[in-house]
């Protein structure tokens, strides 16, 4: 991706460009793994990426499916390293629009240090809606485990859910790195 495209895609809240760089790196790694499995992979159109939360289309023996790829994340901006235990789930994005959980992707691919855990989105929605206390909003990101959280000055609505619980309760498969 060119520097010009990077600037176009960078969110105004991503002041350093770190978020877009991390996300693009995860997408490139996902592509490499898919290609190593001899799968056909196609980039979503920019509009699909932004409005439908679809990054890629993958064709395998089951057919073609869409995926939204999520890079490893820190639980808090103050953390120095990304971690693999807790997954940030987005109900609403920073503009207050539909978050990626309710986007049009068939699957969500969560990057970890060792793999991508690829989860059926419908089963993820069902699980998250069942375990997150939507009536309990917290002020700090460190308290967002199974509770809703909004960042100051933004319209997003987020929560954190344990990846191990997602794997226990949602349809998924794993691609090793």
Q: Predicted regions span which residues?
A:
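Conserved catalytic cores of phosphodiester-cleaving nucleases, focusing on short active-site segments
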Residues: 34, 56-77
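Catalytic cores of nucleic-acid endonucleases
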Residues: 9-17, 43-44, 71-122
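Acidic-basic catalytic patches of nuclease active cores, encompassing PD-(D/E)XK
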Residues: 1-48, 73, 80
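Beta-rich nucleic-acid/ligand-interaction surfaces
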Residues: 46-57
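Generic preference for hydrophobic/aromatic residues in regular secondary structure cores
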Residues: 36-44, 67, 76-96, 116, ...
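Short connector loops at helix/strand junctions that flank enzyme active sites
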Residues: 51-53, 62-66, 84, 102-105
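Non-catalytic C-terminal interaction segments of nucleic acid-processing enzymes
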Residues: 6, 15-18, 113-177
């Amino acid at each position: 991706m060119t520097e010009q495209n990077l600037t176009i895609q960078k969110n105004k809240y991503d002041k350093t460009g770190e978020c877009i760089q991390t996300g693009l790196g995860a997408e490139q790694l996902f592509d490499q793994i898919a290609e190593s499995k001899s799968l056909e992979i196609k980039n979503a159109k920019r509009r699909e990426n932004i409005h439908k939360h679809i990054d890629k289309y993958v064709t395998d023996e089951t057919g073609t499916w869409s995926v939204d790829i999520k890079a490893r994340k820190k639980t808090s901006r103050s953390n120095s390293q990304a971690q693999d235990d807790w997954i940030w789930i987005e109900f609403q994005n920073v503009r207050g629009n539909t978050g990626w959980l309710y986007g049009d992707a068939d699957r969500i691919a969560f990057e970890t240090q060792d793999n991508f855990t690829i989860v059926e989105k419908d089963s993820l929605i069902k699980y998250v809606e069942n375990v997150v206390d939507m009536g309990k909003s917290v002020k700090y990101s460190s308290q967002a485990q199974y509770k809703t959280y909004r960042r100051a000055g933004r319209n997003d609505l987020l929560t954190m859910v344990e990846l191990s619980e997602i794997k226990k309760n949602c349809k998924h498969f794993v691609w090793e790195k």
